[in-house]
């Protein structure tokens, strides 16, 4: 493709970034202190195919636990797998926009998460890509991952909404892009045949995908070879085997340099005579939709009798494209491409802080899909121009775009028997809440993203189909009932009644009375009318039923149970929504739960074989990676779907001591979970991690499987580095991170105008996270309220003759903040608007040379009402091509960050400290704890100490030694010592297991 960098294979940067054990045992931190959370080096596509080929030759379909361990896959495999069955979508015949072609599909050929390798995997990084427009998406490309390594959490989210997610991409490009590679290394693998002519790796690939629960493979094949007869034969063999396996949602997606499909190319790129070869993205022409859409539709029909799987590609670097041409070939699907490591929707999104960025991201997606008004029933006119990614002239990004809903019908999978439930979770949160109160810190997990609304947002005058703008719905991360987000309804003007139609459904009560549970929060003291109503539309009567949610009695979250007494079992509900009555511009209501349930009950299968990996352990915190299996009959494919075990989701629980109070700290639909930085307050805490399954009835629970996580000796653990503002850090999965570590840093920083001033110099790069906490170096800017201050800042100037590049801070935006109200965060608004943003320097997608050639002077005034006392100034630089990463917390892109100490003095009246509007106090214990839990035997911490001759083990039942390429070097049973003479010099990864606790440590053999 034009102007794009070459896709790189997964790197070992994450593995090698942490310091390995050397000869000095006294200074070695324990294995559990490792900050390397994931290790995907075993997920090499060819090695995986060869493993499954061996398994097939042995007459089996999937690997044993021992084979997974020996291949270096065991600790990560459940984070790659999806146990959520892809749900079927309802008929689109009654689609909202009847001018669309009912069967027209959308292929989002973009990254799954931001960054390669670990992008999209569960983490503690709240501000992360949580794509949510599955309600229009048929196929998702997972472009930032190699084959068979797309995150299972994303597959779970996709499958809940009826979307297929490819396992990753194979990249070939010989069109002239730097570093482009051909398919010469791949073709000999896939064209290998047995003596009977069958393809050696065809059945293994299908079995591998079925075992992972992922839906196919993705090709960028801008090189020769795709039309080789053996390659075509292999691809067609995959479809034939998938059909025999009833693997109906298997896909090969491919695009080449071709912008059109012809009778000549159809067999290689699409199929012929009813034999499928691939789903095809027609390459864009000059970045835009090809003019060959109509002829390609004709060629597809001639070859296969259908256009299903044919997509016209467009490069969304720019949204000023030939959208009007899409109506010339309505039977052709649409494919949005862009870009390699993070999607254009994510990279173009901006926000002053993490909350604003995450909220803006959902709104940007909504304008891109539902149209610039964020209402699919009220879309701007179709135009090929003025569809701007960035805010222009006060107009929000994509605010004039017609939206993909103009061409693509909406989709929904909500059908069958009750219950139905949503917490309006979008898969991320600044903290984890349970029933309104905090139980854990920042989190990101797409496997805890609820089924998304069918319509974003379909707002009408009550009881009509007249478009209304009197209520503005949005997802908010400022609060949550359970999880990390909620639905926020805000009034814009007076209205007698406004309907928000959320879900298209085909739901039926099967037994007993039908009830609804709705959690709401107004944030206002005292008893108040919520003016909120649950509305359900009955399929047979074509009528809306309305039920009052009731009053709020205070400012905190409240859950209301509503008896839907006039709905009998067997009644079919085909829409669910909310109605607001008598609203005005001051109306605001948060909705954190919407559940419809009946008397159906059925217990889930029990959880078993829980394994805990301890990560990032400090004296006062630790992170855990938990994985488990389920006590049910194994499927032929080796993959058990949750619904086969009557499981809706899993809950991760925490308690302090065997009899401690229990908290829910995470939910997931995967058979694995990561919980970061569990607060243990002091080294004497005795954490237990529990896992249980929740039934499809949403009220039955399996027994909790408890594991005591024995703490490492506190004297060997590092201190938890605390930063009340949270430390920003370089995104190591983003392109150019290593360059940033070498040449992107602030060399000089001077303040003028204070009672005391700062004069900071750096003589070398920072490296690591590229963040400097200079608040501890003794220098302080002391400044009185109302004083004008000048700062002078210079970035290091890189030179080609010295650094082999000039990729320094000139290519960045820079922005500064001061905490002026002592709330330990940085208000994103500018000083002139009452915020805490001091300045912004740099230009979008350009270099600004004076940021590195001399001291750049910036002047601002400390507000008269700034709070006095110690505070902090933060300056963050982020790449000028990714303005969305320019925020005071979280990860920045190819940049640098630094904090300085500030002391504000004065006697003028001070601005107040903002109140924390979250519910306060200790969270309730989870429901259903009456079921007796099961506690695994206590496992003492595994320890590894290295001397000149051996690796010495303590409390280790099994150990595995891996080279940096993922090769297994040794398997050890009950080891006490291992002679290192058998290992060549280099870095090795040692995984140690005691009972069901795993710790990992790196060692260097010299």
Q: Language-model features: where?
A:
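Chitinase-like catalytic core of GlcNAc-active glycosidases
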Residues: 97-292
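Short carbohydrate-recognition loop motifs
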Residues: 469-499
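Beta-strand-rich modules
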Residues: 676-702
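C-terminal outer-membrane/trafficking sorting elements
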Residues: 925-1006
């Amino acid at each position: 493709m034009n102007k794009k960098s070459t896709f790189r294979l997964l790197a070992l940067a994450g593995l090698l970034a942490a310091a390995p054990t050397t000869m000095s045992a006294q200074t070695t931190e324990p294995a559990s202190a490792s900050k390397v959370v994931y290790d995907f080096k075993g997920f090499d596509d060819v090695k995986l195919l060869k493993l499954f080929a061996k398994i097939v030759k042995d007459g089996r379909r999937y690997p044993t636990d021992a084979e997974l361990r020996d291949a270096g896959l065991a600790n990560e495999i459940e984070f790659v797998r999806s146990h959520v069955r892809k749900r079927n979508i309802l008929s689109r015949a009654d689609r909202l926009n009847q001018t669309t072609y009912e069967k027209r599909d959308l292929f989002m050929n973009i990254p799954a998460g931001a960054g390669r390798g670990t992008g999209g995997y569960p983490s503690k990084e709240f501000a992360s890509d949580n794509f949510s427009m599955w309600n229009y998406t048929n196929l998702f490309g997972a472009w930032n991952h190699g084959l068979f390594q797309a995150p299972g959490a994303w597959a779970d989210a996709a499958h809940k909404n009826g979307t297929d997610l490819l396992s990753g991409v194979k990249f070939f490009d010989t069109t002239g892009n730097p570093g482009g590679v051909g398919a010469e290394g791949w073709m000999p693998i896939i064209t290998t045949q047995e003596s009977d002519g069958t393809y050696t790796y065809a059945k293994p690939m299908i079995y591998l995908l079925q075992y992972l629960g992922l839906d196919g493979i993705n090709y960028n094949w801008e090189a020769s070879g795709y039309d080789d007869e053996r390659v075509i034969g292999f691809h067609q063999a995959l479809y034939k085997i998938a059909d025999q396996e009833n693997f109906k949602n298997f896909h090969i997606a491919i695009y080449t340099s071709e912008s059109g499909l012809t009778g000549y190319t159809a067999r290689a790129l699409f199929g012929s005579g009813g034999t499928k070869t691939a789903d095809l993205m027609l390459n864009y022409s000059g970045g835009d939709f090809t003019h060959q859409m109509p002829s390609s539709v004709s060629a597809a029909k001639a070859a296969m009798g259908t256009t299903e799987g044919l997509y016209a590609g467009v490069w969304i670097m720019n949204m000023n494209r030939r959208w009007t041409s899409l109506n010339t070939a309505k039977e052709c699907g649409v494919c949005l491409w862009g870009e390699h490591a993070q999607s254009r929707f994510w990279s173009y999104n901006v926000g002053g802080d993490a909350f604003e960025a995450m909220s803006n991201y959902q709104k940007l997606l909504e304008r891109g899909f539902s149209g610039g008004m964020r209402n699919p029933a009220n879309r701007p006119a179709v135009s090929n121009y003025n569809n701007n990614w960035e805010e222009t002239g006060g107009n929000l990004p994509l605010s004039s775009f017609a939206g993909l809903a103009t061409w693509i019908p909406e989709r929904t999978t909500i059908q069958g028997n009750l219950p139905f439930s949503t917490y309006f979770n979008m898969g991320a949160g600044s903290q984890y809440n349970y029933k309104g109160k905090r139980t854990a810190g920042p989190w990101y997990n797409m496997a805890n993203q609820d089924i998304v609304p069918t319509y974003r947002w379909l707002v009408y005058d009550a009881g009509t189909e007249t478009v209304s703008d009197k209520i503005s719905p949005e997802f908010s991360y400022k609060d949550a009932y359970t999880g990390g987000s909620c639905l926020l309804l805000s009034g814009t003007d007076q209205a007698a009644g406004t309907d928000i139609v959320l879900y298209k459904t085909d739901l039926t009560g099967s037994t007993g009375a039908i009830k609804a549970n709705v959690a709401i929060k107004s944030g206002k003291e005292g008893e108040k009318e919520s003016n909120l109503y649950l509305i359900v539309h009955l399929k047979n009567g074509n009528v809306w039923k309305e039920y009052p949610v009731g009053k709020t009695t205070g400012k905190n979250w409240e859950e209301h149970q509503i008896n839907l007494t006039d709905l009998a079992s067997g009644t079919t509900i085909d829409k669910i929504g909310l109605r607001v009555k008598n609203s005005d511009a001051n109306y605001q209501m948060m909705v954190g739960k919407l559940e419809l349930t009946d008397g159906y009950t059925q217990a889930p299968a029990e959880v078993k074989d829980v394994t805990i990996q301890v990560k990032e352990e400090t004296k006062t915190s630790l992170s855990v990676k938990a994985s488990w299996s389920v006590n049910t009959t194994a499927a032929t494919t080796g993959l058990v779907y949750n619904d086969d075990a009557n499981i809706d989701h899993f809950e991760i629980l925490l308690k302090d001591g065997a009899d401690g109070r229990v908290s829910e700290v995470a939910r997931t639909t995967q058979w694995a979970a990561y919980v970061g930085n569990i607060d243990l307050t002091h080294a004497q805490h005795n954490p237990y991690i529990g896992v249980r399954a929740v039934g499809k009835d949403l009220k039955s629970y399996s027994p909790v499987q408890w594991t005591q996580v024995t703490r490492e000796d506190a004297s060997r653990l590092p201190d938890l580095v605390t930063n009340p503002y949270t430390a920003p850090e370089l995104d190591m999965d983003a392109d150019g991170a290593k360059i940033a570590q070498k040449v992107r840093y602030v060399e000089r920083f001077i303040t003028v105008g204070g009672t005391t001033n700062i004069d900071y110099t750096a003589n070398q790069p920072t490296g690591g996270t590229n963040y400097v906490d200079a608040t501890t170096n003794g220098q302080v800017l002391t400044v009185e309220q109302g004083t004008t201050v000048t700062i002078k800042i210079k970035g290091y100037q890189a030179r080609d003759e010295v650094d082999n590049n000039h990729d320094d801070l000139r290519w960045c935006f820079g922005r500064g903040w001061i905490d002026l109200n002592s709330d330990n965060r940085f208000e994103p608004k500018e000083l002139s608007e009452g915020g805490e943003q001091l300045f912004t320097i740099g230009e979008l997608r350009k270099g600004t040379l004076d940021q590195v050639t001399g001291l750049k002077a910036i002047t601002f005034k400390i507000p008269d009402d700034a709070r006095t006392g110690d505070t902090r100034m933060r300056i963050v630089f982020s790449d000028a091509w990714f303005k969305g990463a320019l925020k005071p917390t979280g990860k920045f892109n190819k940049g640098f960050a630094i904090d300085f100490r500030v002391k504000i003095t004065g006697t003028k009246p001070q601005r107040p400290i903002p109140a924390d509007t979250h519910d306060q106090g200790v969270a309730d214990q989870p429901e259903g704890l009456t079921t007796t839990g099961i506690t695994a035997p206590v496992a003492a911490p595994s320890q590894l100490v290295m001397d000149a001759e051996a690796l010495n083990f303590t409390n280790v039942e099994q150990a595995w030694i891996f080279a940096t390429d993922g090769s297994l070097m040794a398997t050890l049973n009950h080891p006490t010592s291992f002679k290192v003479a058998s290992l060549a010099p280099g870095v090795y990864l040692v995984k140690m297991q005691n009972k069901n606790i795993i710790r990992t440590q790196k060692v260097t053999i010299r």
